Amino acid sequence: MKLFLTSLLLIAALAAPAANNPAVESMQRKLDRIQANGESAHPRPLTTTMTEQEVNAYVASGRVRLPKGVQSARFSGKPGVVDSVARVDFDQLTAGQRSANPLLSMFSGVHEVAITAHASGAQGVGHVHIDSVALDGVQIPDFVLQMFVNHYIKPKHPNLGIDNTFQLPDRIDSAAVGNHELTVSQK
């Protein structure tokens, strides 16, 4: 489950609830139940729905390690689509890597990044496709985004990109983004 959420974290944004937030505790219980069921010798069919509020509170609580440079992340869902907004310090994110390409120079300093992605999971396989990315409200052309991914993301995370396919953890068979929620099912 954390891998799926981490993939979605590449799609990021802003929130900071209190440490004992009921939404954080509810999310933790759900993740624990999913993990325990997935590790069971005889897992039972289990469907778990996580609300947008729970996901955002959990991410903001610090229980999910955001990539270096991602200062905050907030997600919203509608059927099959995840929208996110993140505050990203590109100098931290790209530390130690520079490019002579002037098109990549926009990826420096601290910016608000808005991402829209299609996300789903079926037959134990998750799929995330980044549809669009905006930097401080300005749409990033696809070819520039692909250059950024190739130069800064792929060297550290070769399995991440614009299109992502991965094995769902904990015997999760399906994952569906709905209106302000994420529902996962284990077989």
Spans of model-derived segments:
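Extracellular/lumenal and peripheral-membrane lipid-interaction modules
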Residues: 17-187
